[in-house]
């Protein structure tokens, strides 16, 4: 992670060293993106900070037994697996995110900003202080967790806190459940039609940028 952070600092610039010219200035359209830890690394490298534990620092919950009492829409991993030994429990959570008024998702990715897609999350850290070079593009259901960021200057520097790359989102695989009373289901079946469409549009945007840069 130290290597990644140093590389991103030199690439994107940082409030931690304002005298250093970002390497990105030589090619402002170059794409840099990331998922989960990638978003966190980009934010820290550029001068932001992290919550080290979401349940404890954001929701004032100190143990798994109280973590699971938090509204499921606002959990970013599954703490039932720390309470009960059940091989069917998924270690992650599927929850909705909301888009901000930033133009990234609405005009760049071209999805409705009113959409609240279901996403795959597996993390306990999150952005606390946002690096000044970024805008927030998405938030958790209650608005407390930053779910997406985009660079204010470089159009192809963006990242999300969730995991759109997980192949089980796009086809039926193992049956899993979040809570003891849930009926086991595939991750793919947990996505509604609009959520699946969102994931495909997001990948479509990434593919478009890569194709343009390969010309």
Model-derived features: positions:
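Catalytic nucleophile loop
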Residues: 22-49, 163
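Short polar/charged helix/loop
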Residues: 52
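Amide-donor transfer/coupling interface in amidating biosynthetic enzymes
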Residues: 4-30, 55, 60, 65-215
């Amino acid at each position: 992670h130290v290597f990644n952070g140093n590389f991103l600092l030199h690439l994107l610039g940082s409030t931690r060293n304002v005298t250093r010219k970002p390497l990105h200035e030589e090619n402002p359209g170059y794409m840099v993106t990331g998922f989960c830890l990638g978003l966190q690394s980009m934010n820290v490298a550029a001068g932001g900070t992290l919550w080290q534990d979401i349940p404890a620092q954001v929701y004032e919950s100190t143990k798994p037994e109280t973590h699971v009492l938090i509204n499921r829409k606002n959990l970013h991993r599954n703490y039932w697996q720390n309470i009960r030994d059940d091989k069917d429990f998924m270690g992650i959570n599927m929850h909705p995110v909301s888009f901000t008024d930033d133009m990234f998702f609405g005009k760049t990715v071209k999805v409705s900003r009113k959409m609240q897609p279901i996403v795959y999350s597996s993390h306990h850290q999150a952005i606390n202080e946002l690096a000044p070079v970024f805008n927030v593009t998405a938030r958790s259901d209650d608005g407390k967790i930053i779910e997406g960021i985009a660079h204010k200057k470089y159009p192809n520097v963006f990242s999300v806190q969730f995991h759109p790359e997980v192949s089980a989102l796009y086809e039926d695989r193992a049956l899993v459940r979040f809570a003891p009373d849930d009926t086991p289901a595939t991750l793919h079946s947990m996505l509604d039609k609009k959520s699946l469409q969102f994931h495909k549009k997001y990948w479509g945007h990434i593919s478009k940028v890569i194709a343009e840069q390969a010309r």
